[in-house]
Amino acid sequence: ACLVGSEMCIRDRYQALYRKWRPKVFSEVVGQEHITDTLRRQVAEGHTAHAYLFTGTRGTGKTTCARILAKAVNCLSPVDGEPCGRCEACRAVDAGTTLDITELDAASNNGVDQVRALREEAVYTPAVLKKRVYIIDEVHMLSTPAFNALLKILEEPPEHLMFILATTELHKVPATILS
């Protein structure tokens, strides 16, 4: 129910705990130090890959690390591989207002048409950020034709492109994608 007067509705002030407390930089991620140290070092040295595959059980930080990596590679003032959180790029990523970072939930968008559309869009250079990043969550849910369509862009990606795939079921990801 809404309060009387100029007070906000309680529902307008509610924020899910996972959103409020989700790590924003690698150093805030708990229990994945070996992974976050590697990612931070790659960003700091400018030696990031064009594709990553994050795997693990639910709640281990795959999507969170993917979002931090996407922010870090686009940060205008990174500090030892960590995103600064203050530059225009970091603020846009945190607010979810940039078109250059796309998250796709493969559990609900698992068809070849969605991946073909992604592939057609991916060839364009980023509108604002340094890199265009696609985070595909639950990638194991893609159909076989969708995996085949994804493979084409993974094999020869443009320089400005990065894919971060996340899965809880690595055994369902085709070997051609894993290589």
Regions found by a protein language model. Give the residues of each.
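P-loop/Walker A NTP-binding region and its immediately flanking N-terminal helices
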Residues: 6, 11-179
